[in-house]
C-alpha cells in the first residue's frame, strides 16, 4: 500500500499537531497512532511512555521538545505527522515544522479556550499560510465549555470557526458528539461498559432530543457558510435546494484550504473519544501536496531570478532540510521535505544554499525514533537522511543540473544567556563537541566567548530551553561544568544619524606601514523585517579600491558584536561608505578592516547610543481575590498592563514586562496566590531601557 501512496499524492497529508503546552497535543498524536494501527499499546505522556516524546528530558518533563516526525495510514491515506512543542521556549521547532507542512490540527483545551501560546502558534501558521482544522480537546475536564472555546477562536484569534460537531454531555458525562454533516450522534462506550476497544469502536445513534434544536440551528449555519464557497452552491442555496453531502464537503475543503474558515471538532483524546472523526477530517478537508501552490525559490547564481517547483516526480529534485537530530546509531539525521522530483538513496545532490556537493547515504521514513528504510525520496513526502555533512536547518538540496535555493526560515534572536565553565581540560573538549552538535540541531542556540573572562556563553529562548541544553550536555556528552545564573541578552542601537565621520588608520613601523582613510555615515534602521544591519557603498571614482570595500563592511560588522555602551551586540544600523583614500604600498585589507571597526565605534558614540532589552508578553490567570496582588507585583517588575478579562471563572491579566523582571517569577506568583495562579510568557520585541535602569546595567557590566 505504501508504494501506491507514494505515486498518488492525493492520498498524502503532511500535517502538524499544534497547540498551547498541556492542551493535549502529544496525547492526541498517541491516539492517532493507536487508531491507525502503528501502536499496539497507548503511550501516556504522564507515564513517560509516549511515542513522539523520545528524548530523555521529554519523558521526564512530560513535554514535547523536538518535533518528532511520524508516518501512519488512515483509510488508505498516508498521514505524515509532526508533533510540535507547545512551550514558548521551543518556538523554533514549531516554526520549522510549519514551514514544511501542508496543513495542521490546532488542539485547544476545552476549559481554557485559546491560550497565549495557542495565539503564538496560530500567528506562526498564518505566516506560512497553513490551513487548519481545530480540535477542542479535554471535553471530559471539569469546567470544559465547547462554546466558550469557539468564542475565543473568534475573539482572540480573529478567525472564522466552522462548527462541525456539538458535544454530547460535558465533563464526566461527555460521551460523544453530534455530527452536523450527517446529522447523527456518534457515541463512544463509557468506561462503565468495560470498553475493551479503547475507543476504537463507537455507535451511531439518533441525535438526543435535548440537542435536536441546537443541532438544526448549527447545521443551518454550516450550510449557509458553505454556500459561499462558489456561485453554483450559492445559487442552489438561494433557490431553496438541498446541498448534497458531497457538495458540502467539497465547499468546506475549498474554504479550509484557502484559510477562509477553520472547521471545529471536539473530543477527549485521553478518554479515547472523538479522535477518529478528526482523522476523517484531516483526510477530507486538509490539503494534499498537490493542493499547495508551487514552491518559490531563486537561482543560486542570480537572486533576482525567481524559479518555481511543482510537487511532481517529473520535476527536477528539490528539498528543504528543516531539522537536524542526533541519532544513537546513525549519528546525524537530517529531516527533509521533498518538494519536487525524486532522488535515490546513495545519490549525489547539491546543497545550493552553501554551494557544496552532498551524498545522501540512506533514507528513512520515521516513526518517532524508529526508522523504516526506503530506496528513494519522492515529491510531497518527509524523510530522514543520513550522510549529509554540511547541511543545516533551512538549507536547500537539489539536482546539480537544475539548481534552486528555496525560501528559508527566519528564527528569532535568543533572549537569555548563561556562562558555562568546564571543570577540566577534558570537559572543555567534550563541551566543544556538544556545542557543535547542539547548535547544528537548533538554530536558536547561540554560542560566544567572553574574551574578558574566557567563559563560554550559551544563549537561547528561555530558562527551560537553556536548562534542557545544559542537561543534554551533561547526559549525552558527559560534560561536567559550572553553570552561571541566567543573564538577559541586551542589545544596543543608535537613535540619531551621524552624516559624516572621517577616520584615518595609519601605522608606520619600518618597512611597509598600514594606511586606510574612510568617510562613513551611520543611521538607525527599522528591524521589523528581521534585517538587523545594512551596508551601502557610495564611493565613486575608485577612491577606495574595490577589493578593500568588503573589508570596511567586515570591520563594521566586527564592531557590531561589541557595542560602545556595555559591550552588547548592536542592531538596527545602516552604514554607508561615502569616500576614502588609499596608499599604493601601505594599504591592505587588514588596514581597511581596522578603519571600518574604529570609524564605526567613533560614529556610534556620537549617535546617541541606547540599550535595548527583551520585552515579554506575560499572561497571568488568577482567581479574582489575588488580582490586586498580581497586578501590583507586575507593576513592581516594570510591567505595563495591556488588558484584563474574565475567562472560565478566573481573571486573565495581560501585560508587557521586561525579561529582566521575570526571573524567579513562578515562585513569587505561587506564594502570592497559594499556587492557584498560572502564567505564560512569550517574546514580544526589543524596547529601549529607561535611562536610570540602563545606567545601572552599564556600570555593572563595566565593573564600576
UniProtKB/Swiss-Prot annotation:
Q: Which Gene3D superfamilies match?
A: 3.30.230.10, 3.30.70.240, Elongation Factor G (Translational Gtpase), domain 3 (3.30.70.870), P-loop containing nucleotide triphosphate hydrolases (3.40.50.300), Translation factors (2.40.30.10)
Signal peptide segment = none
Which Pfam families would you find in this protein's record? EFG_C (PF00679), EFG_III (PF14492), EFG_IV (PF03764), GTP_EFTU (PF00009), GTP_EFTU_D2 (PF03144)
The record's section on PROSITE patterns has: G_TR_1 (PS00301), G_TR_2 (PS51722)
Residues forming the tr-type G domain are 10-290
Annotated GTP binding lies at 19-26, 83-87, 137-140
Provide the disulphide bond pattern: none
Query: Where does this polypeptide localize?
Result: Cytoplasm
Q: Which cellular components does GO assign to this protein?
A: cytoplasm
Domain of life of the organism in this record?
Bacteria
Keyword annotations of the record: Cytoplasm, Elongation factor, GTP-binding, Nucleotide-binding, Protein biosynthesis
Q: Which InterPro entries match?
A: EFG_II, EFG_III, EFG_III/V, EFG_IV, EFG_V, EFG_V-like, EFTu-like_2, G_TR_CS
Q: Which GO terms describe its biological process?
A: ribosome disassembly
| GO molecular function terms listed in the Swiss-Prot or TrEMBL record | GTP binding; GTPase activity; translation elongation factor activity
Question: What's its job?
Answer: Catalyzes the GTP-dependent ribosomal translocation step during translation elongation. During this step, the ribosome changes from the pre-translocational (PRE) to the post-translocational (POST) state as the newly formed A-site-bound peptidyl-tRNA and P-site-bound deacylated tRNA move to the P and E sites, respectively. Catalyzes the coordinated movement of the two tRNA molecules, the mRNA and conformational changes in the ribosome.
Enumerate the PANTHER family for this protein: RIBOSOME-RELEASING FACTOR 2, MITOCHONDRIAL, TRANSLATION ELONGATION FACTOR G-RELATED
Q: Which HAMAP family match?
A: EF_G_EF_2_B (MF_00054_B)
**Record-stated family:** Belongs to the TRAFAC class translation factor GTPase superfamily. Classic translation factor GTPase family. EF-G/EF-2 subfamily.
This protein is called what? Elongation factor G
Q: Give the originating organism.
A: Paenarthrobacter aurescens (strain TC1)
Q: What is the taxonomic lineage of the source species?
A: Bacteria, Bacillati, Actinomycetota, Actinomycetes, Micrococcales
- Gene for this protein? fusA
Amino acid at each position: 500500500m505504501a508504494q501506491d501512496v507514494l505515486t498518488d499524492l492525493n492520498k498524502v497529508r503532511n500535517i502538524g499537531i499544534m497547540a498551547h503546552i498541556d492542551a493535549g497535543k502529544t496525547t492526541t498524536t498517541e491516539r492517532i497512532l493507536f487508531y491507525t494501527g502503528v501502536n499496539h499499546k497507548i503511550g501516556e505522556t504522564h507515564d513517560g511512555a509516549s511515542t513522539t516524546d523520545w528524548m530523555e528530558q521529554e519523558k521526564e518533563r512530560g513535554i514535547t521538545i523536538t518535533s518528532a516526525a511520524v508516518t501512519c495510514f488512515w483509510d488508505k491515506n498516508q498521514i505524515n505527522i509532526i508533533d510540535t512543542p507547545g512551550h514558548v521556549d521551543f518556538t523554533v521547532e514549531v516554526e520549522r515544522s510549519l514551514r514544511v507542512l501542508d496543513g495542521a490540527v490546532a488542539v485547544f483545551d476545552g476549559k481554557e479556550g485559546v491560550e497565549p501560546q495557542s495565539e503564538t502558534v496560530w500567528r506562526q501558521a498564518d505566516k506560512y499560510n497553513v490551513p487548519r482544522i481545530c480540535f477542542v480537546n479535554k471535553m471530559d475536564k471539569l469546567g470544559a465549555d465547547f462554546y466558550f472555546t469557539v468564542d475565543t477562536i473568534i475573539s482572540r484569534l480573529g478567525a472564522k470557526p466552522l462548527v462541525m460537531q456539538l458535544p454530547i454531555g460535558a465533563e464526566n458525562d461527555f460521551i460523544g458528539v453530534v455530527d452536523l454533516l450527517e446529522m447523527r450522534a456518534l457515541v463512544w462506550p463509557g468506561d462503565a461498559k468495560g470498553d475493551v476497544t479503547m475507543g476504537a469502536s463507537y455507535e451511531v445513534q439518533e441525535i438526543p432530543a435535548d440537542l435536536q434544536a441546537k443541532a438544526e440551528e448549527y447545521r443551518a449555519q454550516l450550510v449557509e457558510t458553505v454556500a459561499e464557497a462558489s456561485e453554483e452552491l450559492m445559487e442552489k442555496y438561494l433557490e431553496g435546494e438541498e446541498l448534497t453531502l458531497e457538495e458540502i464537503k467539497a465547499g468546506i475543503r475549498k474554504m479550509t484550504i484557502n484559510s477562509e474558515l477553520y472547521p471545529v471538532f471536539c473530543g477527549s483524546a485521553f478518554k479515547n473519544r472523538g479522535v477518529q472523526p478528526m482523522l476523517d477530517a484531516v483526510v477530507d478537508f486538509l490539503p494534499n501536496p498537490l493542493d499547495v501552490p508551487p514552491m518559490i525559490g531563486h537561482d543560486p547564481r542570480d537572486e533576482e531570478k525567481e524559479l518555481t517547483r511543482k510537487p511532481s516526480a517529473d520535476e527536477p529534485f528539490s528539498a528543504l532540510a528543516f531539522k537536524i537530530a542526533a541519532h544513537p546509531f546513525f549519528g546525524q539525521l537530517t529531516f527533509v521535505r521533498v518538494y519536487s522530483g525524486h532522488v535515490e538513496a546513495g545519490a549525489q545532490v547539491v546543497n545550493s544554499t552553501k554551494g557544496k556537493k552532498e551524498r545522501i547515504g540512506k533514507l528513512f521514513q520515521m516513526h518517532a525514533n524508529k526508522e523504516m528504510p526506503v530506496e528513494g525520496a519522492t515529491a510531497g513526502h518527509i524523510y530522514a537522511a543520513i550522510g549529509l555533512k554540511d547541511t543545516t536547518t533551512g538549507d536547500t538540496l537539489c539536482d546539480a543540473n537544475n539548481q534552486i535555493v528555496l525560501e528559508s526560515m527566519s528564527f528569532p534572536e535568543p533572549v537569555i544567556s548563561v556562562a558555562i565553565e568546564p571543570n577540566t581540560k577534558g570537559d572543555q573538549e567534550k563541551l566543544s563537541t556538544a556545542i557543535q552538535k547542539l547548535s547544528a540541531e537548533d538554530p536558536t542556540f547561540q554560542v560566544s566567548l567572553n574574551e574578558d573572562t574566557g567563559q563560554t556563553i550559551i544563549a537561547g529562548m528561555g530558562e527551560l530551553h537553556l536548562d534542557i541544553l545544559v542537561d543534554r550536555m551533561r547526559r549525552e556528552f558527559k560534560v561536567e561544568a559550572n553553570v552561571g545564573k541566567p543573564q538577559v541578552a541586551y542589545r544596543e542601537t543608535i537613535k540619531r544619524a551621524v552624516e559624516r565621520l572621517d577616520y584615518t588608520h595609519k601605522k608606520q613601523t619600518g618597512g611597509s606601514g598600514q594606511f586606510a582613510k574612510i568617510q562613513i555615515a551611520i543611521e538607525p534602521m527599522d528591524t521589523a523585517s528581521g534585517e538587523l544591519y545594512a551596508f551601502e557603498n557610495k564611493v565613486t571614482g575608485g577612491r577606495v579600491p574595490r577589493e578593500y570595500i568588503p573589508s570596511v563592511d567586515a570591520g563594521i560588522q566586527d564592531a557590531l558584536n561589541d557595542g560602545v555602551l556595555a559591550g552588547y551586540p548592536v542592531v538596527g544600523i545602516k552604514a554607508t561608505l561615502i569616500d576614502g583614500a588609499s596608499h599604493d604600498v601601505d594599504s591592505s585589507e587588514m588596514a581597511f578592516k581596522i578603519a571600518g571597526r574604529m570609524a564605526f565605534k567613533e560614529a556610534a558614540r556620537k549617535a546617541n547610543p541606547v540599550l535595548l532589552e527583551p520585552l515579554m508578553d506575560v499572561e497571568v490567570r488568577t482567581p479574582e481575590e489575588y488580582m490586586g496582588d498580581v497586578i501590583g507585583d507586575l507593576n513592581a517588575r516594570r510591567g505595563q498592563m495591556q488588558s484584563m478579562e474574565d475567562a472560565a471563572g478566573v481573571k486573565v491579566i495581560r501585560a508587557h514586562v521586561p525579561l529582566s523582571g521575570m526571573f524567579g517569577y513562578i515562585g513569587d506568583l505561587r506564594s502570592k496566590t497559594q499556587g492557584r495562579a498560572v502564567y505564560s510568557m512569550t517574546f514580544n520585541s526589543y524596547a529601549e531601557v529607561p535611562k536610570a535602569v540602563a545606567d545601572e546595567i552599564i556600570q555593572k557590566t563595566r565593573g564600576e
